């Protein structure tokens, strides 16, 4: 009976949303090109199918978090899926193409967080294993699970931002069986099988043992959560959620660890250009795609500015 009620609520919500938003589908691809970078405005699957096989040296990105956020009203937007199963079906198409375009022996790094279900939407409160779903999807399509990295985040900041019941001190006092720990971020690294024909080498003068010991830690404790690109210019009047750019510390560590200077770095979900700025700053090349126009415009500006600033010094 409760399940039937949930389905009715879900259908009602979908009907309401369809009245409020006119769904669109962008089928063309427009391209911006700069010094060392290309940015494509269009659906990531359409874009990646135009990329040459085994041409990408490293890929790093943060995908839409299943059905958690609504980013645009485009039918191709993976954030518009109704549930985890539908999202993973669409995401799997992209993973197939990622396997094709990646060079052998090279790495794809995926940023994610496990999602908390809610009573209003799911009828229960528990963590959904989003990171596990991503691992299964990549492994099912031929990738090897290279390593997981946990990114520490402050539970106090999470509590203040979300007012999550499980993090409140009053919950601890009233019934600590309802208390939980804070949510970490994850960077999941996957490797395409085969021999890497261009080893990623490190100069010990630039990368001393201290650097390696910090990066080799299974938990990155020193990521500055506030070090992100300025997102204000990418907002549009129809945004339902706040934009949350990936931390530059995470991007830069991954780019330095798993690619060489001059390598081609790819992000299918460029957003406002964080991965591209990180790649260009570290003397890599970048190719990306972004479906939402306001994000694309901001990313194009950020990429151009990043390269311009480098040429000044």
Predicted segments, located by residue:
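C-terminal alpha-helix
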Residues: 8, 302-306
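Core catalytic lobe of class I
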Residues: 26-298, 304
